[in-house]
UniProtKB/Swiss-Prot annotation:
Keywords: ATP-binding, Magnesium, Manganese, Metal-binding, Nucleotide-binding, Nucleotidyltransferase, Transferase. Its cofactor is Mg(2+); Mn(2+). This is Protein nucleotidyltransferase YdiU. It catalyses: L-seryl-[protein] + ATP = 3-O-(5'-adenylyl)-L-seryl-[protein] + diphosphate; L-threonyl-[protein] + ATP = 3-O-(5'-adenylyl)-L-threonyl-[protein] + diphosphate; L-tyrosyl-[protein] + ATP = O-(5'-adenylyl)-L-tyrosyl-[protein] + diphosphate; L-histidyl-[protein] + UTP = N(tele)-(5'-uridylyl)-L-histidyl-[protein] + diphosphate. It is an enzyme of class 2 (transferase). Nucleotidyltransferase involved in the post-translational modification of proteins. It can catalyze the addition of adenosine monophosphate (AMP) or uridine monophosphate (UMP) to a protein, resulting in modifications known as AMPylation and UMPylation. The active site is at D250. Mg(2+) binds at N251, D260. Belongs to the SELO family. One of its GO terms (molecular function) is magnesium ion binding. ATP binds at G88, G90, R91, K111, D123, G124, R174, R181, D260. InterPro entries: SelO (IPR003846). The gene is ydiU. Its EC number is 2.7.7.-, 2.7.7.108.
Length: 492
């Protein structure tokens, strides 16, 4: 039974300095622990054939399917503000691209598939814990409606990897609209290779921004398109309390997807200064810093594109600055529209921005749980007089008590009835997110006891994040004091 991949590879047709051709390193005993069957079907793959010994070998990198590109992509990047001229796929190999059933080109990448020319001192492998974390969180993000890479499969390798502590090895099959990053442009721009920057820009326009090809200035339209997608993406993160944790330029997707989950986490108690990543000592990538950091990253992209925007560098800089100036308006519009929907506001009033900001301020002052505060407000929309369940979430409800009558007054101006409002609010305010302590418990069960039942259960719960599931009520609960996760780790 042959596993067929309908590859249609475009990135591997670019010049050889865009990547290194390298085969995955075979593993001792591949064991498929999870296959995303609906995603496989969407990609035009046969899930029954993938769910086989041959399929496990392919998904572990032991067998390379016919037609695979098998390349490690080159890129650079600013890591915590410091430029590194060469990073690249140090433990990931792009098998190739397929056209999915929606007509969209998708990358199929093996993460943890062995050393590449970009591995530096790394072993090229991935540990089971980070693989499960990325599988859980990326699929949860998709269910939440956030643009994201996806997880097709997780495979145990039968080998151990040297981490602290030693862990079982695993490989994640990651699906993305592409793995092109801001850092990919930086790789060539930092070397003064304008021809490569132009070739990459042309490839990105054809693949992700075809409308830019028809614009008077295609490269400006490309920059504006990336800015718009990133602004919208970060606004979506802010609606669900998501903290990426490592927003380096090499982790900023040109396609506008969330990528490289590493030390990501979700906020419990609302605090804009929240940081979980063990390596983010200065809070550079704290929850509230994510919008300005996104703009900082986009500015690095704009610097790469300046020579394409005008033959005159000064004029090119001016054009780029004007484009970057649009980020704030785009982000603020998406952010405020998202907050309005979360508060049940279908129309717009001048005081809405202040109303939303004051609710967040009340949550911060009262140390309320971010996700549950919005969800309980949704539940209360059927009877706005009774906000007791919301109030109970606040350690100090003083600011909330001052805010609540203003919200009641504001929604009274809406034409919607309470039932319709509640329905719409519940569609944007999830009851289930990948709570850090729940994800950690799942990882511990798998790593310490080879027990994947909790992994399957959390995936099932998170696949319906907006629908209350009585038997899984515990997944909605914030952590008890002894359950709190204070730090997350990138796993490399």
């Amino acid at each position: 039974m042959t596993v067929h991949f309908p590859f249609d590879n475009s990135y591997a047709a670019l010049p050889e300095n865009f990547f290194a051709r390298v085969a995955p390193t075979p593993v001792a005993a591949p064991r498929l622990i999870k296959l995303n069957r609906p995603l496989a079907q969407r990609l035009g793959l046969d899930p029954d054939r993938l769910d086989s010994p041959e399929g496990a070998e392919i998904l572990a990198g032991t067998r390379v399917p016919e037609g695979a590109a098998s390349i490690a992509m080159a890129y650079a990047g600013h890591q915590f503000g410091n430029f590194v001229p060469q990073l690249g796929d140090g433990r990931a190999i792009l098998l190739g691209e397929v056209i999915d059933r929606d007509g969209v080109r998708r990358d199929i990448q093996l993460k943890g598939s062995g050393r590449t020319p970009f591995s530096r001192m790394g072993d090229g492998r991935a540990a089971l814990g980070p693989v499960l974390r990325e599988y859980i969180v990326s699929e949860a993000m998709a269910a939440l409606g956030v643009p994201t890479t996806r997880s097709l499969a997780a495979v145990l390798t039968g080998e151990r990897v040297l981490r602290d502590p030693i862990q079982p090895g695993a490989v994640l099959t990651r699906i993305a609209s592409s793995h092109i990053r801001v850092g990919t442009f930086q790789f060539f721009a930092s070397r003064g290779d304008r021809d490569a920057v132009r070739a990459l820009a042309d490839h990105v326009i054809a693949r992700h921004y075809p409308e830019a090809a028809e614009a008077d200035s295609p490269y400006l339209a490309l920059l504006e398109g990336v800015i718009a997608r990133q602004a919208d993406l970060i606004a979506r993160w802010m609606m669900i309390g998501f903290i990426h944790g490592v927003m380096n330029t090499d982790n900023t997707s040109i396609a506008g997807e969330t990528i490289d989950y590493g030390p990501c986490a979700y906020m419990d108690t609302f605090d804009p200064k929240t940081v979980f990543s063990s390596i983010d000592h200065m809070g550079r990538y704290a929850f509230g810093n994510q919008p300005p950091i996104a703009l900082w990253n986009l500015t690095r992209l704009a610097e790469c594109l300046v020579p394409l925007l005008s033959d005159d560098d000064d004029k090119g800089v001016e054009i780029a600055q004007r484009a970057l100036g649009g980020f704030a308006d785009r982000f603020n519009a998406a952010y405020l529209a998202g907050l309005a929907a979360k508060l049940g506001l279908a129309t717009t009033q001048p005081e809405d921005t202040q109303l939303a900001q004051d609710f967040l301020a009340a949550m911060a002052k009262g140390r309320a749980d971010f996700t549950l505060a919005f969800r309980r407000l949704s539940d209360a929309a059927i009877d706005p007089v009774d906000l007791g369940a919301v109030r109970a979430l606040f350690d100090d409800p003083t600011a909330f008590d001052e805010w609540a009558p203003r919200w009641r007054s504001r929604i009274s101006l809406e034409e919607q009835n309470n039932t319709a409002r509640q329905t719409e609010m519940r569609e944007v305010n999830p009851i289930y997110i990948p709570r850090n302590h729940r994800v950690e418990a799942v990882i511990r069960a798998a790593v310490d006891h080879d027990d994947f039942a909790p992994f399957e259960e959390i995936l099932a719960v998170l696949s319906n994040p907006f629908r209350e599931q009585a038997k899984f009520a515990r997944y909605a609960e914030p952590p008890q004091l002894h359950e709190r996760v204070l730090e997350t780790f990138c796993g490399t």
